[in-house]
């Protein structure tokens, strides 16, 4: 049980995909202008990462390994992720049209988000068992959600600040992201998997 907790904390904080590995920055910068959209996107990315990792683990261990097709891992994982995101898009469009309109193109970008693909690939490369893969996926998704919510909170506070004209928009967003990354750098080396 302790190893699963360690893996979870490592995925959320120590090896945060956005702030330590710099993956998924397109959605991170694009959606973090609005806190509500960021919370929803964090939940969506977490669910997509988790479900994609579960599907990828099953396909990898019951199809690709037995038939010696592991070289197709990336292509198969991309197809699984794209299919799941398409399903999620259809559900959100029907059930929550306001959220669907708020996210815009970023919902489809989840399918091509490098975090969503990196987690199942790293799970496979790390030879994680099923439960380890699920724990790592949930932790990675929640780490992304935490990072984007922190960023959105800071960006909303900055709307009230007097930001120099050349730094408005993405300029100050990159500075904020760098400061967050430096803060999370302090956790590096605390947990090794």
Swiss-Prot record:
It is a multi-pass membrane protein. Its EC number is 7.1.1.-. One of its GO terms (cellular component) is plasma membrane. Belongs to the NqrDE/RnfAE family. The chain crosses the membrane at residues 11-31, 39-59, 62-82, 102-122, 134-154, 171-191. GO terms for biological process: electron transport chain. Disulfide bonds: none annotated. The complex is composed of six subunits: RnfA, RnfB, RnfC, RnfD, RnfE and RnfG. It comes from Clostridium ljungdahlii (strain ATCC 55383 / DSM 13528 / PETC). Keywords: Cell membrane, Electron transport, Membrane, NAD, Translocase, Transmembrane, Transmembrane helix, Transport. The keyword Hydrolase does not apply. Part of a membrane-bound complex that couples electron transfer with translocation of ions across the membrane. Couples electron transfer from reduced ferredoxin to NAD(+) with translocation of H(+) out of the cell. Essential for energy conservation during autotrophic growth. Contributes to ATP synthesis during heterotrophic growth. This is Proton-translocating ferredoxin:NAD(+) oxidoreductase complex subunit A. It is found in: Cell membrane.
């Amino acid at each position: 049980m302790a190893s699963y907790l360690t893996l979870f904390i490592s995925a959320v904080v120590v090896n945060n995909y956005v702030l330590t590995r710099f993956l998924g920055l397109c959605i991170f910068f694009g959606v973090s202008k609005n806190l509500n959209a960021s919370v929803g996107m964090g939940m969506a990315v977490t669910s997509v990462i988790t479900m994609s990792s579960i599907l990828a683990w099953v396909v990898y261990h019951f199809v690709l390994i037995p038939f010696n097709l592991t070289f197709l891992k990336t292509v198969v994982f991309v197809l699984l992720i794209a299919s799941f995101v398409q399903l999620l898009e259809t559900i959100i469009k029907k059930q929550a049209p306001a959220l669907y309109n708020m996210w815009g193109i970023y919902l489809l970008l989840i399918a091509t988000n490098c975090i969503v693909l990196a987690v199942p690939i790293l799970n496979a490369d790390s030879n994680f068992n099923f439960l380890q893969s699920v724990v790592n996926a949930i932790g990675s998704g929640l780490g992304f959600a935490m990072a984007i919510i922190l960023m959105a909170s800071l960006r909303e506070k900055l709307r009230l600040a007097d930001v120099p004209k050349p730094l408005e928009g993405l300029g100050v967003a990159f500075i904020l992201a760098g400061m967050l990354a430096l803060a999370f750098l302090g956790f590096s080396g605390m947990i090794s998997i």
